Regions:
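A short coil-to-beta-strand element that immediately follows conserved catalytic motifs
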Residues: 72-79, 245-255
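A short, structured active-site edge motif that brings together acidic residues
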Residues: 74-90, 134-137
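Conserved Nudix-box catalytic region and its N-terminal flanking loop in Nudix hydrolases
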Residues: 18-25, 203-246
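NUDIX/MutT-family hydrolases
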Residues: 141-144, 161-167, 270, 280-314
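Active-site-adjacent beta-strand/loop module that shapes the phosphate/pyrophosphate-binding cleft
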Residues: 247, 256-280, 292-294
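Acidic, metal-coordinating catalytic segment for phosphate/diphosphate chemistry
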Residues: 169-196, 200-202
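Domain-level recognition of soluble alpha/beta enzyme cores
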Residues: 122-158
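Active-site-proximal alpha-helix that buttresses catalytic centers in soluble enzyme cores
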Residues: 2-83, 126-127, 223, 234
Length: 326
């Protein structure tokens, strides 16, 4: 046995929303379950070198949550429609097309397909636990595989273990997988970045503020730093999503601040961002927020986060100084 197949069933889905099955979202419980499996894989150094997922909402989000916790690039997950509502034959075909270089593959999908594939590879019926579920939601099956992903026959695999997220710690180690401190969310959630978007109009600086997701106050783009990106690149990603802007993020931080969330302190690094492109209103996915260009004084007056006020003032002075040198 030279390779390993990791079969992960999606996390617990949310049936409260009236949506088609393909678009059914995860519950928060389902997201945490996926992250616990990811942490377990990281702790045992079982990170996959190839990830393929059903594109159904509950499956791809499960894949992303698990992969991010391991510090891997969620954008590199391969999505394959055949995994959704799949027969064993479909899943075998997906595996047959796996890159030859892949030694450990993570496939994220659904039942009954994953259970059927597990028994096919084991070559026999697998005794069920007391609850009658072989692979319930947010559960991982580890299967040792032969050296070739193609032409897999019954009995070619060996089921090594089945890990349920429900059996793992409810909290997450911080700041690394071997730490004893436990927190409510994965470690990377507490490392965040933000940008203050600006432009020069008629020789004067203007700053772009957006409304918070619940439209209660004015903010600048901020979010969890993606583990595989730099703080600046993560902040640029948030700016595109939350404010509908693209531009150049400065290499030097304007400062940082901390705030309480998820039972601990989150640290936020703040960067200047020169806006080069404003996404048209009808193409901006979060246009419900609203956005507005403001003078430095207006931005300082409106911004909710007190720690950002001196940073806006600092950036305005920096821009004025640059102007005077020209």
């Amino acid at each position: 046995m030279a390779r390993e197949l990791l079969l992960l069933r999606h996390g617990k889905s949310d049936w409260s929303e009236q949506v088609e099955d393909f678009k059914r979202p995860l519950k928060d419980r389902g997201k945490r379950g996926a992250q616990r499996i990811g942490v377990w894989l990281l702790q045992y150094q079982l990170q996959p070198d190839y990830v393929v997922s059903s594109p159904a909402e509950r499956a791809i989000i499960t894949a992303q949550k698990a992969v991010k916790v391991m510090g891997q690039d969620a954008d590199k997950i391969t999505q394959d429609r055949r995994i959704y509502a799949a027969r064993v034959e479909d899943l075998l075909q997906v595996l047959a097309e796996t890159p030859k270089s892949a030694k450990r593959v993570l496939m994220v999908g659904h039942n009954p397909g994953l259970e059927a594939l597990t028994e096919y590879l084991e070559g026999k019926r697998i005794p069920l636990p007391k609850d009658g579920k072989l692979i319930p939601t947010a559960t991982l099956a580890r299967i040792s595989m032969p050296n070739d992903w193609k032409k897999l026959r019954p009995g070619d695999g060996k089921l090594d273990s089945i890990i349920r997220a429900s059996s793992l710690d409810k909290k997450f180690p911080f700041p690394d997988p071997t730490s004893k401190e436990m927190r409510d969310r994965p470690a990377y959630y507490y490392n965040q970045s933000s940008v203050i978007p600006y432009r020069i109009k008629d020789g004067k600086p203007e700053f772009l503020l957006v409304r918070s997701s619940k439209q209660k106050h004015w903010v600048v783009p901020k979010g969890i730093s993606e583990p595989w990106l730099t703080l600046q690149a993560s902040a640029a990603k948030e700016a595109f999503e939350e404010a509908g802007v693209e531009g150049d993020v400065g290499s030097e931080s304007l400062g940082s601040y901390k705030y309480e969330k998820w039972g601990a302190e989150c640290s936020v690094q703040v960067y200047p961002m020169l806006v080069k492109n404003l996404i048209p209103e009808d193409e901006w996915e979060e246009r419900h927020r609203g956005r507005e260009w403001l003078s430095p004084d207006e931005a300082i007056e409106r911004i909710k986060q007190a720690e950002l006020k001196p940073m806006i003032k600092k950036l305005a002075k920096m821009l004025e100084k640059q102007k005077s040198k020209k």
